[in-house]
Swiss-Prot record:
Gene induction: Down-regulated by heat treatment.
Disulfide links within the chain: 22-84
Biological source species: Arabidopsis thaliana
Tree of life domain: Eukaryota
Membrane protein topology class: Lipid-anchor; GPI-anchor
Name this protein carries in UniProt: PLASMODESMATA CALLOSE-BINDING PROTEIN 2
Compositional bias annotation for Low complexity: 106-116
GO biological process, one term: response to heat
Keywords: Cell junction, Cell membrane, Disulfide bond, Glycoprotein, GPI-anchor, Lipoprotein, Membrane, Signal
Tissue expression summary: Expressed in the shoot apical region and in young leaves but also detected in the laminar and vasculature of mature leaves.
InterPro entries given in the database record: X8, X8_dom_prot
Propeptide: 172-194
Cellular component GO terms held in the UniProt record: plasma membrane; plasmodesma; side of membrane
Coiled coil: none
Length: 194
């Protein structure tokens, strides 16, 4: 009987995962959030829901749109924790940031979109410009390569420059994201054996 209970407990614990979302940090200026938003939208995030008539357009402010964009980017990168850094302007959360009418994806499959992404410029855009078309994997919203400042490189332990320079699309490695689940399963198994 004990082996059966242990087996069922192990299956129960191994099957439990908690969803993760990425959101912009509080206390940052709108200009910093706008740069983060532009980067995420210009590098593969599905920002269409934040456009006028989109399900996540309201509230129409930089923070809300930034939250949706960085989460979309994070989900498209397979929830790799380093893809939610944006040089310190975003953070991981286990609290669902969705609100009435706007569902934030909690997995890569829930973050749809392919091909080109249309990015709505910020308030400081030249008059007459309605949108900028960028393509996944390229076309950074910045001119040139930043070298200093909040969004620049110039970090001694980084391997690249920009908001998220160390993200790797390498998927052959193994990462243990929910180590506390493994520890809890091991502890429960040990208790069951005694």
């Amino acid at each position: 009987m004990a082996p059966l209970v242990l087996y069922l407990l192990t299956l129960l614990m191994a099957g439990h995962t908690s969803a993760s979302w990425c959101v912009c940090k509080t206390g940052l200026s709108d200009s910093v959030l706008q740069k983060t938003l532009d980067y995420a939208c210009g590098n593969g995030a599905d920002c269409n829901p934040t456009h006028p008539k989109g399900s996540c357009f309201n509230p129409d402010n930089v923070r809300a749109h930034c939250n949706y964009a960085v989460n979309s980017f994070f989900q498209k990168k397979g929830q790799a924790s380093e893809s939610c850094n944006f040089t310190g302007t975003a953070t991981l959360t286990t609290t669902d940031p969705s609100y009435t009418g706007c569902a934030f994806p909690s997995s890569a499959s829930g973050s749809s979109g392919s091909g080109s992404t249309t990015v709505t410029p910020g308030k400081n855009s030249p008059k007459g410009s309605n949108s900028i078309t960028t393509f996944p994997g390229g076309n950074s919203p910045y001119s040139g390569t930043p070298s200093t400042g909040l969004l620049g490189g110039n970090i001694t332990d980084a391997t690249g420059t920009g908001l998220n320079p160390d993200y790797s699309t390498e998927s052959s490695g193994f990462a243990l994201y929910y180590s506390n689940n493994l520890l809890l399963t091991g502890f429960c198994s040990l208790v069951m054996m005694l």
